[in-house]
């Protein structure tokens, strides 16, 4: 646990509770003021109908109505402040839970589980309690997908030189973001209640782009006529107050405006409403996201590039937000009548929509892509901020495999982890023996998970780690599939076949195997394991293999330049003592019979 950071999170929660309480008190005052001002406005309209020569009451009613709209606007802004503060409070509450080891409040990414993936299934990258769940703070499905792709080996598609530059830029970007906790929390708060559905946004944008609006709505002459109409309407109101024109002129003019707006837009307003309303719950998150990024100054090259790719997004999403607000204003019959009478609202909505469509249609995909990458980087930066004991890895350019780690440990174990030193050289094989529960499988996963972190520019759980770029393949968690008639042993063979097919002569690879051929008898397993390792050792492959077969360790005697024995030793006395420390040589003690005797006694 990062005690300093945990204290900061709890302090923020206390402050936000007080802020929310104050804002809710204001909200109650605004509601009462709205009811009162609207009632007064209606009262003056009633007076106009019952008094003689009382056109002045319409002017007062109009002024009070404007006051009502002003108070309503303040109330809306106050409600948004309450929602923002509540979302930020939820962000800090989740981070406090993370600090105490409760990861259930974060998405586990179970939809990304792939048993046939080269390494993610074996290394617990996705699923409950996974690496993804510990890192993921994304507020959009696009950001979540990008993060999942990154942890799944996205780096393997890049040439080494380009990848090294990419890692360097990402380390710089993550470091800068991690140093700005308020920005990270504000960013995460935009999707705290409900994540942005990027696929739905893309689909909605597709519908918007496909919508055909008559060009005359964008004609300058049409716009001038609309403005002239409204100027004349409001002029008639003031003239009627001074008894220069009949009092009923503005009333009939307002009715005319209502029917004019309805006639001009009845074919299109519904289509625009349906298309934009699909974005209603999503676009506000993008507006806030783009606003935060636009206001923030960055020095990291990767962040500056993403910000540049979002250029214009704030204006675009802001215009959509304003269109949505106008649609909200016509969400009931009273709103439709009032806003069309006084402002030709429906015509304004269609005109603004057409202008947005013409201006921003070609580049929305670029904005969504940049937002998704930035979203994933915020998650990575939060991970770096929370894990203050983790260190930056050094990724080197090498034609072969190189993996040197000092005091490396598994990130899931926290303070109770036992740290180990381990070096892996190109085209060499490391046979690890040891008793059950001695730490072999955990150590294999330690190597794999920290490599994934290093390739993504994330801090690793070691005092020092120096690693080259290579392809990773694991075989640790084979499962049968009776639905498709695949037995456990057959599944193992298919996995090994997949491993062999993944190898490329010009691409260095590491294979991490936990018990080759577990689904057969001991002698057959030993012979098969030897056959496989002798075959694979002729390829451009480096391997780390955990096994209970002590006989397999004799490969070092036969080829000491290629095979090396390591072990996790235990101590047997009145009980079993596990050191979880790796050392040279073959394991001497086993514990299966010892533990079974304890059960049977």
Spell out what each predicted region is.
Residues 245, 380-383, 387-601:
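ATPase nucleotide-binding head domains, primarily ABC-like/P-loop NTPase cores
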